[in-house]
């Protein structure tokens, strides 16, 4: 009895590649018939188990990776860093775009990598995971867009959109993301239909080119072939890379491994031999190819190889041309469909990086390094030669070899971390590049400045276009220009501060426009009569009567609360004694005030709680308050609804707070584990992962099907039938120790909460409560500012308000203030009270900070065109009036004499009493004083301020102020619409000010009055420049923040210097804005706002130096190179572009000057004529192989595998024609005529005057119209033209192709049985014919007998070895 053979058992998962290998082996070992039976059994088993398992795809099967949120946060952080560096001017827009693309592409790839482990861990039998990763349906990219992120998209031009789609299809896309997604998907179904038609037309053209190619011979006798090199680098796609690209080919030479022959010439390569070649062969091998077949219009078996259908040598008569055309054109439809499904997702490769293996110190030589910038704008060094980097950690040492022309991203002796990028290695074969122009738009209006050499472009030598010669910064200095043709009788010089509407004829304030930058006059005007006469002669101004109250406090070492600046209000202002301080936060500036308007609120919270609950009034008494400030204050981006102070506190009393917990859940109702009205103990799970914090009642309110609000009412539950009768009537609060019902006493302050259906089912909940005692302030109104000799025009009083109503439920996540203390105005009606406004000003001097609370009353005056210098000293008021230190009288009744302040700066003539005309004084730094007269009319006031009560405007201005090592940059808000500078002066009358020293106030006794210190105002200069003036609506109630910076003593800066944002100039503090130094004094440094833009070499600047541009103008164009994106959307058009031989933007670097290089090298070896001939052959062969590789890359990027032999057949027909040149003598061809390559070669073997021609690459359409058959050409395109031309030329169609025989109804010259019929007809002609044609003999002599006959063998071998080094394979006879 024979032994039973052992059956092999493979216990492994059979995915798509595994099934592919199984089918291939079955066909190889048992044949097609038996393999089909085995596969039928596999199919039956698969259907059976798929039916039992019941696989279906649902929306819940799409599981998002839990790490996505972390990846998104990290990517957003990197994107914000790139944005900051672009704003600082360290990188330009292109480098920012590259960083952004790199960041989001890496994030997308990490998400894709985490997708498979997440499925395997959480749900290994997930239908999405099984279908995609087994290869049954879909791929990783499509599943990644379902559960990961959509990623970066390409626009219709193929450029990457810098806004990534962070959502996936499971989460859903926003409107913006959907529009971008439509860009990438190329408009969906319509485009898909168009691409499908294009794919069909591509298949028709491909079949048209090669329809006549049939296998006719077994061996054509060719000894030439194409070389395949071993694959060494992962980035270089080579034909030697995998066994699939070797299987089915035929060797052109014998194959040796270590002097042992493992395969002979004309031997086909099977799977085992292919694996051995890949593993052991280190040199290039030569294989047969359709490109080198000697047959004229057909192919031989050896040059074609295996048939892809049967896994054996192709049979004679096989129509391999049609098979090749269809195999290339059919995946074009797949490219189209995948374009629609995946939608233009960016799939670019990240540069190949060299990373550190472990932590340590890097050492390398810096002798041959040259400084440069990486493509992301980081500093880098390029190495001209190979460099060795040594990583050393303690006694461990590791060496890395970096090839030449690589970017080194670290310095020597630098500590590096594990996996840190050390260098970027460039590929040996540079990919195709294209030049792109990036337009840069200005963010500011202003002048263009640059400090590097530029030149005019050669195309526009007389224009304002300039080309940047070296990389540098272009600065836009903030500003605008205002030209006018009117006459203004006024004298001023460059640098003087002027009113903002100085050049306008009328004051036009548009209250409906916000975020509009104001114009200011910046152009320097010379002191010539001609320019002065052209200025405006009449201007209308808005004068504002300003008064102020302020307090001063001391801060040490610049440590103060910047986010909450306070003002201090003292109880009895008339006696100047300090009893109590209240900290108040001012409301936002520019608010129009009326009677009962809140101007400040207390910053000290006494009665606040931190959770939700219910308000219950105790013994307090309230009354409604007629508030004028309860309207909503809105911003552009968000709406803020402030608390409405409705109820004024009348007397002291108590208020109760009953806490509860409120949570909002977004889930289905079934996910909530408790029911409405249930009493739950502490620790009970309410929702997945959420537990009860305390025992209490649960109330559930469903807003929608997915949004539910859960209210947890803490307390103790009492359930008794007699509970309602035993309760004390009309009492709901019980203090600790009081009896609630017989036998139950309150442990804490308790509130009774009754709930139930009726008396029989009443339940009682004992809820904990809090009690607050609120004390009523006994405060009389304060006469803050006497206006026009009176003290009762405006008053400010302290009020306390209850914010919430009795029984109101309060919902808030933060602190809740129950009672608020506010400053309320009390203004009597008068001529100025309707347009009263208030704002605050902070003034810094040494270590004192002065806060001014200013009240403004508007009136309008009209300046006449007259100049006067009369008696201006008598009418001059000063901003800072001084009193004697010994003076203790009431400031309101004090009549102080005017005296000039001995400090530098600008003074202004203020309003005089009892006069109609108002005087205005301008004082420049050279003490040139002019007085202008003005008048006021009621009509102008009504016309210009008709909307003044409905819409409020403020002007935002930057102040740069320094004083004794304190550098302050403050966002300054003022209401003066005309004054461009606010410093040690005001527009109109300022009667008095109070200055309090905070430290001195603490030491004073209660009855002592305060002294006014005159030394505080000595040598005080501060300026406000209006380059950043803006109109804004009242949008927010945020506090005004002040930033302090210290100035070092030795700062070497000059006028006109530019400084970028975050540059450290003053100790360790950084500049908050970029700017140019405009003014320097001993203690002051004024910056003009700027914006830097980095421009690279050869960038184009639109405009001249100091030219004015507006915001949004395109003023720089950066020209840069980028790799051509291997985008899915470009699959089918890219294939069509290659097959039609359309020129690309740039040639690949390995083809540049390739012919000249080969010609030079071979001419040096073999002489000029032979060198020229051989270099032509080699460069043609190289071009053919490069075209095959380019087409393969497009298909391989989509996962489509096409046999190389099919592409080689197509390329063979594209290069089968040559173009005759004008160097020909008298022969049968004209210059520029297309001739068959084989025909030209045979003619040159006979003719004495050889035919001069050059190779040409024809597209498939043009090649289809230049074949041997005019019937085939006429059936393809241009029927009339082709037939007419053929008739004139007398062409004969020998009906050798398939198409022409189909048209005429003849026997198709193809098929496995056609060769027998052909052999039977021509048996007499072909019998015993062994003579060699004279043409073949002549060709062999020319091609291979290059050296003289007496050349020695050793010389032949040396030349042959040299040619092999140049990758040329020839055999000498």
Swiss-Prot record:
| EC number in record | 2.7.7.6
The UniProt record lists the keyword Transferase = yes
Gene Ontology BP term (one): DNA-templated transcription
Its recorded reaction(s) are: RNA(n) + a ribonucleoside 5'-triphosphate = RNA(n+1) + diphosphate
Q: Which family does it belong to?
A: Belongs to the RNA polymerase beta' chain family. RpoC2 subfamily.
Its function, per the record, reads: DNA-dependent RNA polymerase catalyzes the transcription of DNA into RNA using the four ribonucleoside triphosphates as substrates.
Q: What is this protein called?
A: DNA-directed RNA polymerase subunit beta''
Organism lineage string:
Eukaryota, Viridiplantae, Streptophyta, Coleochaetophyceae, Coleochaetales
